[in-house]
Amino acid sequence: MQICGIDDAGRGALLGPLVIAGVSLEKKNLRKLTSLGVKDSKKLSPKIRENLYKKIIQTVDNYYVAKIPPRSIDASVRKHLLNNLEAKYMAKVVSKLDADTSYVDSCDVKPLRFGKEISQLSNGHKIKSYHHADSRFVVVSA
């Protein structure tokens, strides 16, 4: 069974793009990520994150990175649609990776609503949406 983990980085347009990244692998291989030392990137130094990146890419079956330019972020903020923009790009990653189940880090105050939106935008893919998913699921941390 293929599972996918998706997280964002850089929600502030002032500092650059918003990046949505996902990885997919067989569920039985999750221990490989744990043994590499993969965990929430906020708990790792930049050097360790950089070293882990190469190892993660070699370990997972597939990955996809989407970058949202600052002007798109600014336009969404003005319309109060930043969460919607993020859901659209997460759905794009979900569709590209096409796993059986995708775990996402919810930016919405209502994770279930966020997961349903991503599922609808990705043609019914199974989504598990949680707050702090990057701390709870190693596949999201990757």
Give the role of each language-model region.
Residues 1-4, 8-17, 23-142:
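Acidic (Asp/Glu) carboxylate-rich active-site/surface patches
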